[in-house]
């Protein structure tokens, strides 16, 4: 993926704060040794071991010393109830504000000084709160990247890449071809 060329040019993520809104991150994973990861989750999450897989692997792709795209960046992790994790008892319950909701987490990330917000999800949730949170990020110069999804289908209406200001990302395999599981669509800006 030409990481050696990027690093030779000094592109390591130094001075960049990335907000990752995803499942829990197992910071004790060997590949994350030495990475600058801060858990900024607004509520606790009781996790099952398998619930950490996606968040941990996404964090490693970003900041792992050996193969991360930006190993010198600071990663702020905002945990969701993705996977088999469940929200802790300090969550504000139904009828109130769910602090684990994506609009709230996006706003937390902006307030915490994120330069980039990465969303590893696709969703048909087009709520006003989510639209306003993304619009606020874009208006403040925060770059938002979002997965095209893993449904192996044209997902024009279920990923955020087609929203103005959001960089849609599909997946490629080691040969640079679209990964068999990756979704695609008009909102895809790049592939990684």
List where the protein language model places each region.
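Subtilisin-like serine protease catalytic core
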Residues: 5-38, 45-97, 126, 162-164, ...
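Topogenic and prosegment regions of secretory-pathway hydrolases and membrane enzymes
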Residues: 1-23, 27, 104-116, 139-144, ...
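Sequence contexts marking disulfide-bonded cysteines in secreted/extracellular proteins
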Residues: 42-44, 108
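Structural recognition of the beta-strand scaffold that forms the well-ordered cores
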Residues: 17-21, 74-79, 110, 115-120, ...
């Amino acid at each position: 993926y030409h990481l050696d060329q990027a690093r030779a040019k000094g592109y390591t993520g130094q001075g960049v704060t990335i907000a990752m809104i995803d499942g829990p991150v197992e910071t004790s994973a060997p590949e994350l040794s030495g990475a600058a990861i801060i858990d900024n989750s607004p509520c606790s999450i009781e996790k099952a071991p398998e619930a950490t897989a996606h968040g941990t692997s996404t964090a490693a792709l970003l900041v792992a010393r050996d193969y991360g795209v930006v190993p010198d960046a600071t990663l702020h992790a905002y945990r969701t109830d993705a996977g088999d994790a469940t929200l802790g008892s300090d969550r504000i319950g139904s009828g109130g504000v769910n602090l684990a909701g994506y609009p709230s987490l996006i706003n937390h990330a902006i307030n915490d000084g994120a330069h980039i917000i990465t969303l590893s999800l696709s969703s048909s949730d087009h709520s006003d709160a989510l639209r306003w949170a993304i619009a606020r990020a874009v208006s403040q110069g925060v770059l938002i990247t979002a997965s095209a999804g893993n449904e192996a289908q044209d997902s024009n209406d279920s990923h955020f890449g087609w929203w103005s200001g959001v960089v849609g990302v599909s997946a490629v395999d080691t040969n640079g071809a679209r990964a068999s599981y990756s979704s695609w669509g008009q909102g895809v800006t790049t592939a990684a």
